[in-house]
């Protein structure tokens, strides 16, 4: 659980560092699949997509913790 919390904190810090409120995506933009996008001049976060990914991480961690309680 600590590892997942550390990962979430790291994602949050990274998101705060590279946040740019524009969400325009062009052909030269690279998506990292977690809501973070970068092109040659800047990086930014699509917070709607990032929140979905963070929620998925939290839910899967919670569910795997419940599954491990039976052992």
From Swiss-Prot:
Biological role stated in the UniProt entry: Bacteriocin that inhibits the growth of wide range of Gram-positive bacterial species. Does not inhibit the growth of several strains of Gram-negative bacteria.
Disulphide bridges: 38-43
PROSITE patterns, alphabetized: BACTERIOCIN_IIA
Cleavable signal peptide: 1-27
Gene3D superfamilies: 1.20.5.130
Family membership: Belongs to the bacteriocin class IIA/YGNGV family.
A Pfam family of this chain: Bacteriocin_II
Keyword Secreted: yes
Originating species: Enterococcus faecium
Thermal properties of activity per the entry: Thermostable, retains activity after heating at 100 and 121 degrees Celsius.
Compartment list: Secreted
UniProt keyword list: Antibiotic, Antimicrobial, Bacteriocin, Disulfide bond, Secreted, Signal
Listed GO biological process terms: defense response to Gram-positive bacterium; killing of cells of another organism
GO CC entries: extracellular region
Protein name as annotated: Bacteriocin enterocin-P
Activity's dependence on pH: Stable between pH 3.0 and pH 7.0.
């Amino acid at each position: 659980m600590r590892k997942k919390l550390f990962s979430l904190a790291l994602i949050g810090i990274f998101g705060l560092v590279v946040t740019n409120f524009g969400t325009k995506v062009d052909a030269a933009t690279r998506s990292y699949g977690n809501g973070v996008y970068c092109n040659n001049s800047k990086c930014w976060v699509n917070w709607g997509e990032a929140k979905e990914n963070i929620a998925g991480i939290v839910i899967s961690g919670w569910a795997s913790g419940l599954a491990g309680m039976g052992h």
